Every structure is written in C-alpha cells, then in structure tokens.
C-alpha cells in the first residue's frame, strides 16, 4: 500500500484533511502541536479505470475497479506540525522527519490565509 505523509506547519489543517479523507476522528484544536504523534488511516485515491480509458482488459492486483472507476488503497499519515529548525530538534523535530522520510510521497498542506507564524501560533491573517 502506498504511504502518503501529510506535512506542513502546525495549525494549517493537516488533521482536518486527514479526518475528511480517512473518516477518522483525530483531535483538532486551535493551538500549536495538537498532533503530537503520527496518526495513520486508510483512504482511497480514485481515477478512471484503465480498461475504460484505453479500451483494454483490466486485471487490477493492487486496487479494484467498479463502474469504470479505479479505487487505489492508500495509507495516509498525519504528521505533527513542522516549524522552523525542526531538523535541529525544535518542535517535535526528528520524530517528524523520521516518519516523513518513510513515506512514499508527501502532501504539503498550506494555510493560504497567512494566519500562522513561524512558531505555529495563530496570528492576524496575512501576517504569518
């Protein structure tokens, strides 16, 4: 199964996305480092099935095909927030980086409102 890590600064919505994609109920709060340990859950990536797209015989081994749609199982990993200097051990530091390195791919969740400063604290929008 493909492992995808969710990375980004603290308080950017990683756990909200994780809960929506996996139907989990991990804690969500408006303070830095609500997520202290990685959470894992299963989800599915959905794409057009190869038999429909290329008009060929389909024999999926790592997924399933239903009504022309391919459902590919993935493991999502909700990682603790990243702050400046994590590689030096700041915040949850190396604990975060070790799990991120074990992922097959990373999704960088970004808070476009600019309401989170470099330490992960909520600030006025546009100042973070």
What does each of the following model-derived ranges do?
Residues 1-127:
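Conserved G1/Walker A P-loop phosphate-binding module
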């Amino acid at each position: 199964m493909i492992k995808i890590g969710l990375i980004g600064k603290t308080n950017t919505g990683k756990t909200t996305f994780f809960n929506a994609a996996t139907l989990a109920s991990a804690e969500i709060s408006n303070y830095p480092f609500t997520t202290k340990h990685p959470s894992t859950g299963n989800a599915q990536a959905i794409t057009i099935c190869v038999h429909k797209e290329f008009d060929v015989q389909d024999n999926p081994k790592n997924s399933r095909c239903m009504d022309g749609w391919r459902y590919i199982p993935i493991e999502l990993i909700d990682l603790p927030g990243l702050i400046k200097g994590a590689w030096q051990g700041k915040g949850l530091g190396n604990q975060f980086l070790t799990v991120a390195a074990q992922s097959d791919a990373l999704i960088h969740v970004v808070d476009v409102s600019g309401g989170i400063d470099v330490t992960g604290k909520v600030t006025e929008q546009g100042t973070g």
